[in-house]
Amino acid sequence: MMNKGGRLRKAVRKSIPATFRLFLAFNFFVYGLAKVVIGQFGEVTPEIEAAAGKGFTIAWTFFGYSHVYELFIGFGEILAAVLLLIPRTAALGAVIFMPIIVNIVLINYCFDIGVQDLSTILMVMCLILLWMDRRKFMGIFRQEPIDSRQVMKR
């Protein structure tokens, strides 16, 4: 019979990744839809072209210049969100999510976008998910085969 501490650890070990996956998926789905459906960055106006000096204005104008880039990032966020919601594909979703969120964190800090806290939290959550699934990725770095039963456990 499992003691209370063992049950609690097991529950936490399962609930934290699930909670992180849902939180990341929700945030990326919302931001992805904002880019794909309404255009998060906006269009370049004469006023914005004349403005200089504000990092946020310059960055948003730059990203808004290319609708293709906005759609690419938006669809990437939506794909990562959907994959994070499905337990069998959650690790792949985290892998897709990671370069996107690292880029977002750098942009937020370098251009003072103002949502540094949220983007940093999302990145740390993704890192934790990747760390918890590290056994799934070990085969990439090893020569010997990995037992699939151990990888798919969880």
UniProtKB/Swiss-Prot annotation:
Organism phylogeny: Bacteria, Bacillati, Bacillota, Bacilli, Bacillales
Native source organism of the sequence: Bacillus subtilis (strain 168)
Protein name: Uncharacterized protein YwoB
Bilayer-crossing regions: 20-42, 62-84, 91-109, 113-132
Places the protein is found: Cell membrane
Keyword line: Cell membrane, Membrane, Transmembrane, Transmembrane helix
Any single GO CC term annotated in Swiss-Prot or TrEMBL for this entry: plasma membrane
Keyword Cell membrane: yes
Primary gene name: ywoB
Source organism superkingdom: Bacteria
Membrane topology summary: Multi-pass membrane protein
Record bears the keyword Transmembrane helix: yes
